[in-house]
């Protein structure tokens, strides 16, 4: 088995606002990874503690992103793979093997595998899911302060009832993904008026 294994995961794929963020994490062989879990199963305060530990104790970590304009231009799958490739390219050490959460392997220059449910079963992927979630949530909270009225700090860009209601009453903003159906519907309604 390869000695340096990177885990990759993304956050924001199902959102209708904001970027998609991917993280890549490499642990030193034999490193203690106790307590890591899929970011969706952790309380926000626990995610923050673990993210700090991952950043300080992992052999290497990096974050990549795809902007709203890239998501709208490429489609969400290709934009997600772009964010993943950017995360791996930003690593200060290149991995020998990559494990990606999901069912499709991105076009990386290193070998690896896609693992469905990897965020719950592979420590490196769980760590990447935690970093990606913490980084994206922080960005959405900053965006909420810069553009109040959409409650981005609450729903983080996901298509919740609150977000859809705010989108309908306020219209789409620069951070909304125009290629996504709920946003497109609001734009179409406002242009028909």
Curated annotation (Swiss-Prot):
Report the cofactors.
Mn(2+); Mg(2+)
Which residue spans traverse the membrane?
Answer: none
- Which GO annotations describe the biological process of this protein? DNA replication, removal of RNA primer; mismatch repair
Which InterPro entries does the protein's record reference?
Answer: RNase_HII, RNase_HII/HIII, RNase_HII/HIII_dom, RNaseH-like_sf, RNaseH_sf
Q: What EC designation does it have?
A: 3.1.26.4
Matches recorded under PROSITE patterns: RNASE_H_2
- Per the record, what are the reactions this protein catalyses? Endonucleolytic cleavage to 5'-phosphomonoester
The EC category is hydrolase
Similarity comment text for this entry: Belongs to the RNase HII family.
Annotated protein name in UniProt: Ribonuclease HII
Q: Which organism is it from?
A: Methylococcus capsulatus (strain ATCC 33009 / NCIMB 11132 / Bath)
| GN (gene name) | rnhB
């Amino acid at each position: 088995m390869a000695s340096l294994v990177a885990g990759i995961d993304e956050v924001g794929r199902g959102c209708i606002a904001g970027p998609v963020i991917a993280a890549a994490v490499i642990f030193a062989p034999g490193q203690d990874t106790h307590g890591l879990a899929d970011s969706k199963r952790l309380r926000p305060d626990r995610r923050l503690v673990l993210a700090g530990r991952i950043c300080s104790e992992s052999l290497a970590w990096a974050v990549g992103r795809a902007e709203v304009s890239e998501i709208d231009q490429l489609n969400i799958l290709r934009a997600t793979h772009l964010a993943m490739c950017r995360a791996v390219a930003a690593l200060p050490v290149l991995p020998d093997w990559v494990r990606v959460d999901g069912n499709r392997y991105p076009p990386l220059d290193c070998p690896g595998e896609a693992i469905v449910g990897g965020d719950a079963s592979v420590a490196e992927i769980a760590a990447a899911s935690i970093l990606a979630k913490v980084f994206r949530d922080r960005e959405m909270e900053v965006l909420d302060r810069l553009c109040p009225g959409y409650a981005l700090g609450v729903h983080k860009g996901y298509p919740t009832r609150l977000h859809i209601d705010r989108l309908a009453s306020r219209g789409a903003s620069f951070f909304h993904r125009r290629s996504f159906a709920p946003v497109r519907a609001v734009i179409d309604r406002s242009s028909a008026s």
